[in-house]
Regions:
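Hydrophobic, aromatic-enriched alpha-helical segments typical of multi-pass transmembrane helices
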Residues: 1-224
Length: 224
């Protein structure tokens, strides 16, 4: 496969993966939401997952597939840009992003585990494991995304201002993840929904920047 066709395929993967991921995110927001006051966080999310039934399996399959497409697109982008100009931070950002995506996919797959184990296990424990993976890999993925976005800004690969703003948003989300991670480590906060609001609000806002970023970068790759 030529570099041109590889870049085009990578761009298509970014566009398609970005759109699917964003649609799944919007659906999850519409049918879900933060826990009500005094509700045990892990039990709430586990029960919400069970309540969605087999739809959870569909959402998880689609979201996982979308993230695989996005990861491939970023990998192709890195290869293409490295051929033009070597950059260690771009390579590091790509690696961190892909590792973070793998973590996200593992965490999301635990939704299916909750469905499968609903009649034989403490599903709240599975939800707590899911959230721990999500919180630990989240900063890795967003740091990687920030490094890649800053590199694109320096190359003016896409609109430099938008790329820098997106990178700043990603860095703020990292702080929100870390803040929520330490708060939820205290069992006394497990019945306080506001404990996880910073992380979930951050990633929700970031999703709107991400889908536009994926479309901009993907379409640029398809033109190369």
């Amino acid at each position: 496969m030529s570099n041109s066709s590889s870049s085009k395929l990578g761009g298509q993967c970014l566009v398609v993966g970005g759109i699917i991921s964003f649609i799944i995110f919007i659906i999850q927001i519409l049918i879900g939401g933060p826990p009500p006051g005094n509700e045990h966080i892990f039990s709430y999310f586990a029960n919400e997952t069970v309540g969605r039934g087999s739809a959870t399996v569909i959402y998880t399959l689609l979201w996982t597939f979308a993230n695989v497409l996005i990861a491939y697109g970023i990998l192709v982008l890195n290869g293409s840009l490295q051929e033009q100009q070597k950059d260690g931070l771009l390579g590091l950002g790509t690696f961190l992003f892909i590792v973070g995506q793998i973590g996200f996919m593992i965490a999301t797959s635990m939704d299916v585990a909750i469905i499968y184990a609903q009649d034989s296990a403490n599903i709240a424990n599975i939800a707590s494991g899911q959230m721990s993976v999500f919180f630990m890999f989240g900063p890795v993925a967003f740091l990687g995304g920030a490094l890649v976005s800053l590199n694109l800004a320096s190359r003016e690969y896409i609109n430099a201002l938008y790329a820098r703003i997106t990178a700043v948003v990603f860095l703020i989300v990292i702080v929100a993840f870390i803040y929520s991670s330490f708060n939820i480590a205290d069992p006394g906060n497990h019945n306080i929904p506001s404990t996880i609001i910073p992380a979930f609000a951050g990633i929700s806002i970031a999703q709107f920047f991400i889908v536009i970023w994926n479309l901009m970068v993907g379409m640029k790759m398809m033109k190369n």
